[in-house]
Regions:
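Conserved phosphotransfer cores of two-component systems
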Residues: 49-52, 74-81
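Acidic catalytic/metal-coordinating carboxylates
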Residues: 40, 67-71
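Acidic, metal-coordinating helix/loop segments flanking the phosphotransfer/catalytic sites
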Residues: 37-56
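Two-component/phosphorelay signaling modules centered on CheY-like receiver
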Residues: 12-36
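Active-site residues of response regulator receiver
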Residues: 9, 59-60
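Hydrophobic/aromatic residues positioned on beta-strands within the core alpha/beta folds
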Residues: 87-88
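Alpha4 helix (beta4-alpha4-beta5 surface) of REC/receiver domains from two-component response regulators
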Residues: 70, 77, 91-95
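Receiver (REC) domain active-site loop signature in two-component systems and cognate sites
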Residues: 63
């Protein structure tokens, strides 16, 4: 089974690190995955179409413009099946 994974983070190094961890996780489990990076929620929405559904999304909580939480709310109205994980480098937001 292959997974399509989207990572939305405005900090490029964070996004690349998440991609590396995600791909290592998939390799260890002998799963195929295709990972795509997006620098903003708006960039994700622009690139996302009905035929390009993601299985898993990793969304940065704090981004300029639309936040990861706002993006998740928008996506949930359209697709209740996608798995969403929130990520942050702000310790006060981690729980």
């Amino acid at each position: 089974m292959g997974y399509r994974i989207g990572i939305c983070d405005d900090e490029r190094s964070q996004a690349q690190g998440l991609r590396d961890m995600t791909e290592a996780w998939a390799r260890e489990r002998r799963l195929s995955c295709r990972t795509e990076l997006f620098p903003s929620a708006e960039a994700f929405l622009f690139a996302c179409t009905e035929d390009s559904a993601f299985d898993i999304l990793l969304l940065d909580v704090e981004m300029p413009g639309m936040t990861g939480i706002d993006l998740a709310k928008t996506l949930r109205r359209e697709n209740s099946r996608v798995q969403i994980l929130f990520v942050t480098s702000h310790f006060e937001l981690a729980g």
